[in-house]
From Swiss-Prot:
Annotated transmembrane regions: none
Protein known as: Toxin TseL
A biological-process GO annotation: lipid metabolic process
Source organism of the structure: Vibrio cholerae serotype O1 (strain ATCC 39315 / El Tor Inaba N16961)
Chief location: secreted
Gene: tseL
Subunit note: Interacts with VgrG3; this interaction allows TseL secretion to target cells.
Reported phenotype of the disruption mutant: Deletion does not abolish killing activity. However, triple mutant lacking tseL, vasX, and vgrG3 fails to kill Escherichia coli.
Lineage: Bacteria, Pseudomonadati, Pseudomonadota, Gammaproteobacteria, Vibrionales
Pfam family, one: Lipase_3
GO cellular component, as recorded: extracellular region
């Protein structure tokens, strides 16, 4: 029966039924295969496909009918339409109340529904069965469809079939939105599938991997990433593109990570160094620590149940992985040299992941990680590049140590990698360029006759010029006073991974003089994530030029204040000499002068770098800060605020 060739008003004695299917934003939903069934005579059915969101059935029997829609058309068509903005009044309900039915007599009947009110058979997807089950109070478990009466126009607003996913901008250019998103995803790698963190004690699960993925699928906003409360930037997607996750944990080495995926992309997150130095296993007894004599003849303090320390995630990371800086040349990386500890950690995780990686080989790959996790993410990216040659492979790391030598960096220079450093984070400074803990490299029998210092230096340093180097394009957050930072993107730092003839010698903008000035306090994701979010907030409303100029002005004021403080302390020091001031107090004044002078030097370095940047058009974009070459979209600005 063609609904457009039937006239209700032309046939007032005949019964009819009109149905409209609308999205939450009052858009007509076409392509739905709708069937109405007479409740008194179930063999009496009619079927039409929605056009302009409508079907009209004429010449039908009076009585109760039930409308159902093919499950396939529901799942295919409804997910195409976006959700209504939160708090907005339903435009469907408003319009239905103002319009007359097909007979031009009564107002239309409005109903808010879900796909579960109409599907002719329930999908196998248990999530859909639970989250989109029917809400019709007259629904029947035995019979599919929505209960209706003849001679009515029903307007059905169908709940959007949508999910969330973190905002990922599809670009090879640096953008701060991606930096923030993958910082959260790197933090998520510290969670387990079921708990906020992997310490064997935590029972909280707001930031567990399964919790976050389930919330995104339900189109709910997660409020945690791991054990850190955080604001996720999200975009709405069709339900068929909702993310799923697989968690991996290898017990012997302690490697952990995940693959989050849909039909288009795969995100690999690798856990960094665990900050937990107690075993996840329950203690067997209360045995105390005791002193024993080691085979080497050196005294050691250990516990009877030594596994309480060595079996902890943090100790495994520290001893088995982080401190093993020997350079090895595995065949997987074409004979180039990598850090042995990081290699072993990565291969242990890969032994679990590998069977699933092949399922995603034609998708876009994104890899991320913090600290040790960044090292693992880089090595996995290299293996993915060699094995699958994916169309897109992008890597985001935070506080990542050096992973491979020059030969490794040269081989994998085409992997797009944005490497983030917070202030003077210590971890990116290690292993030092010259380090190699393979004690046999370059070792000669006559070396045993050298001094202990020389022998130790030879055993712990590299013996050739294929030294540790950083991979990736540097972005650095720099604090210029107690409350403010500036972001140096790869365009501003210009610390390239490889500039053809010369490998960059700097691994971060030189605002500190050495490792003694670097800080482990600035290493945690609880530092990186808020700092990146503050940059997003600031740069969503002003240009990078204005942001830098404000920083320069603040630095000039702070330098002037520090210089005045220095002169005041210096005058006090001069007056203290020879007037009987205790030596300890004089020493304190000298120490204070030294500290102030170091602050002045640091602030001058940052100011000088910023002045160079703002005077160079090649390093300073003219627009407000960007996702690629565009300003932030309004929907992202709203979430940031």
């Amino acid at each position: 029966m063609d609904s457009f060739n039937y006239c209700v008003q032309c046939n007032p004695e005949e019964n009819w039924l009109e149905l409209e299917f609308r999205s939450e934003n009052d858009e007509p939903i076409d392509g739905l295969l709708v069937t109405i069934t007479n409740q008194s005579a179930p063999s009496n059915t009619y079927t039409q496909t929605t056009s302009s969101g409508k079907v009209l059935f004429g010449k039908i029997a009076a009585g109760e009918w039930r409308a159902s829609v093919s499950q396939a058309s529901l799942l295919t068509e409804v997910e195409k339409y976006a959700s209504r903005k939160e708090g907005q009044e339903s435009p469907v309900k408003k319009r239905a109340a103002a319009e007359l039915d097909a007979a031009d007599k009564d107002t239309k009947q409005y109903r808010f529904t879900t796909i579960g009110d109409f599907w002719d058979e329930a999908p196998k997807d248990e999530f859909l069965q639970k989250q989109h089950k029917g809400i019709d109070v007259n629904a029947s478990a035995e019979k599919a469809g929505f209960r209706l009466s003849h001679n009515q126009t029903y307007v059905f607003e169908i709940k959007a079939l949508r999910s969330y996913m973190p905002v990922i901008i599809d670009t090879d250019e640096f953008n701060l939105v991606n930096s923030y998103t993958f910082a959260l995803l790197s933090k998520l790698a510290y969670a387990t599938n079921d708990f906020n963190r992997d310490d064997g004690k935590t029972i909280d699960n707001q930031g567990a991997i399964s919790t976050v993925i389930s919330q995104l699928k339900r189109k709910e906003r997660p409020t945690y990433s791991g054990d850190l409360q955080a604001k996720w930037l999200l975009e709405e997607i069709p339900y068929s593109k909702a993310l799923s996750a697989q968690y991996y944990a290898e017990d012997d080495v302690g490697s952990e990570g995940y693959i989050i995926f849909n039909d288009e992309l795969a995100i690999i997150g690798v856990r960094g160094t665990e900050p937990y130095f107690q075993s996840k296993k329950p203690p067997v007894d209360n045995t105390k620590f005791k002193i024993i004599k080691a085979a080497s003849g050196m005294a050691a303090v250990i516990a009877d149940k030594i596994e309480s320390a060595t079996d902890s995630p943090g100790m495994k990371d520290l001893i088995i992985t982080d401190l093993d800086a020997a350079q090895i040349a595995p065949e997987e990386f074409g004979g180039t040299y990598v850090h042995r500890g990081f290699y072993q950690y990565t291969m242990a995780l890969l032994s679990l992941m590998e069977k699933d990686l092949g399922l995603h080989k034609i998708k876009k790959f994104y890899c991320c990680g913090h600290s040790l996790g960044g090292a693992g993410a880089l090595l996995i990216s290299a293996l993915i590049k060699d094995s699958y040659h994916p169309p897109v492979l992008r890597l985001y790391t935070y506080g990542m140590p050096r992973v491979g030598t020059r030969s490794f960096v040269e081989r994998y220079q085409n992997i797009l990698h944005y490497r983030h450093v917070n202030n003077h984070d210590l971890v990116p400074q290690i292993p030092t360029v010259w380090m190699n803990t393979d004690v046999s490299e370059g070792f000669h029998v006559l070396d045993v006759f050298k001094s202990r210092v020389d022998l130790m230096r030879k055993m712990l340093t590299d013996d050739d010029d294929d030294n540790y180097q950083h991979h990736g394009h540097l972005s650095q957050l720099l604090t210029y006073n107690s409350n403010n930072q500036v972001l140096l993107t790869p365009k501003q730092t210009q610390v390239t991974m490889l500039d053809l003839a010369n490998l960059a010698t700097n691994d971060s903008v030189a605002m500190v003089d050495g490792l003694s000035d670097a800080s482990i306090v600035e290493h945690g994701m609880e530092q990186y994530i808020p700092n990146l979010f503050e940059q997003l907030t600031a740069l969503s409303d002003e240009s990078l030029m204005v942001h830098y100029q404000r920083a320069i002005s603040a630095l000039e004021q702070e330098i002037a204040t520090l210089q005045q403080s220095y002169l005041t302390v210096k005058q006090a020091w001069i007056e203290s000499i020879g007037n009987g001031t205790p030596t300890m107090n004089i020493g304190r004044l000298m120490s204070e002068m030294h500290s102030i002078n170091k602050l002045i030097e640091n602030r001058n370095k940052i100011r000088g770098e910023l002045r160079q940047i703002v005077s160079d058009p090649q390093r300073m974009p003219a627009t407000k800060f960007l996702i690629s070459q565009q300003t932030l979209p309004d929907e992202i600005k709203v979430q940031i605020r």
